[in-house]
UniProtKB/Swiss-Prot annotation:
Keywords: Cytoplasm, Lipid biosynthesis, Lipid metabolism, Metal-binding, NAD, NADP, Oxidoreductase, Phospholipid biosynthesis, Phospholipid metabolism, Zinc. NAD(+) binds at residues 95-99, 117-120, 126. One of its GO terms (biological process) is phospholipid biosynthetic process. InterPro entries: G1P_dehydrogenase_arc, G1PDH, Glycerol_DH. Substrate binds at residues 122, 169, 253. This is Glycerol-1-phosphate dehydrogenase [NAD(P)+]. The lineage of its organism: Archaea, Thermoproteota, Thermoprotei, Desulfurococcales, Pyrodictiaceae.
Length: 349
């Protein structure tokens, strides 16, 4: 099996890392080049002036607003950016801005630089993009960021809920890897030990620093960011989202279909990890305690969802991506089995 691995070429992490932007742009775009900056209005209001002060007089740039992560908007944005003819695209903001930037860069065939301002999920370093309205409710392959600039001062000042959600996305690797191994054993699917161990290492660091991450301690946020980058790199190495996404993500995607916008991605997959760990016969209670220490919801009620929504999502999850084998099997869970699972793990009352 021929396996091509595309990795980020430069990663800058630390306090004041944003100041490395000019150096990174010189390396990947060149002086006096034209770049497109895709960012949300709030991020641009907070950090746009700083961005300008770093790049002004060095490169030409145009700002494009990341309004929503829908396919329809991504296509409109693509046409707007295409008219500007940039040599490089910068995603500056949260997951939405970075996903849109990866999609636009991929369609234009240019490089992309990821500059995250919040750590809500592991898309900051991965070659996969999640857009609403795709025929499949999961990530699709686009482009690997050529460089990642993660300023811990900026990221640690993000809302605590986003920080906790990022940790939830890493906790999910505990069941994602078990699902991947299962698919390898039962279906003969390719399994990459190195990518799997790299993703698991990210989860283990979150467990170790759970209390500090849950409080938003800057040093722990750095550990979280490095874990998110490592998870993205694991996906690059594997050539798929397998090291990062299993049955817990299928559950989260099902939730998004039933109750869109009710919870953050990391919150959903963390809740799913508790239940999927139970199905795997693992220490789900330890997972639940860790998620609680992170300050993440561990019940449907805390997530603002009804018991029925949780059970329905569990029964739907195996159909979200039928080609991806997980602990849910090919037939999935009956309503009774799903309800029992959610009750035993304390997700529903």
């Amino acid at each position: 099996m021929l396996h091509r691995i595309e990795l980020p070429q430069k990663i800058v992490v630390g306090s004041g890392a944003i100041d490395a932007l000019r150096e990174v742009l010189e390396e990947f775009a060149g002086r006096n080049s034209s770049i497109a900056v895709i960012s949300g209005p709030n991020v641009w209001r907070l950090y746009g002036e700083r961005f300008r002060s770093i790049v002004e007089g060095f490169v030409e740039y145009s700002f494009f607003e990341a309004r929503n992560a829908s396919v329809e908007y991504a296509e409109k944005l693509l046409e707007d950016v295409k008219a500007y003819s940039p040599s490089l695209v910068v995603g500056f903001g949260g997951g939405k801005s970075i996903d849109l930037a990866k999609y636009v860069a991929y369609r234009l065939g240019v490089r992309m630089i990821s500059v995250p301002t919040s750590p809500s999920h592991d898309g900051i370093a991965s070659p996969f993009t999640s857009l609403k309205g795709l025929d499949k409710p999961h990530s699709v392959r686009t482009v690997t960021p050529a460089a990642i600039i993660a300023d811990i001062d900026i990221i640690a000042s993000a809302p605590i809920r986003l920080i906790r959600a990022g940790a939830g996305d890493l906790i999910a690797k505990l069941t994602a890897i078990r699902d991947w191994r299962l698919a390898h054993k039962l279906k003969g699917e390719y399994y990459g030990e190195y990518a799997a161990k790299l993703a698991l290492l990210s989860a283990k660091h979150v467990i170790e620093y759970a209390s500090q991450i849950g409080r938003g301690v800057k040093e722990a946020v750095r550990v979280l960011v490095e874990g998110l980058v490592s998870s993205g790199v694991a996906m690059c190495i594997a050539g798929s989202t397998r090291p990062a996404s299993g049955s817990e993500h299928l559950f989260a995607h099902a939730l998004d279909l039933i109750a869109p916008g009710k919870a953050l991605h990391g919150e959903e997959v963390a809740l799913g990890t508790i239940m999927m760990m139970y199905l795997h016969g693992g220490d789900w209670r330890h997972v639940r305690r860790t998620i609680r220490r992170l300050g993440l919801p561990v019940t449907a009620k805390e997530l603002g969802l009804s018991d029925e929504v949780i059970v329905k999502a569990l029964t739907m999850a195996h159909r979200i991506r039928p080609e991806r084998y997980t602990i849910l099997g090919e037939s999935g869970l009956t309503w009774e089995a799903a309800e029992r699972l959610a009750r035993v793990t304390g997700v529903i009352g």
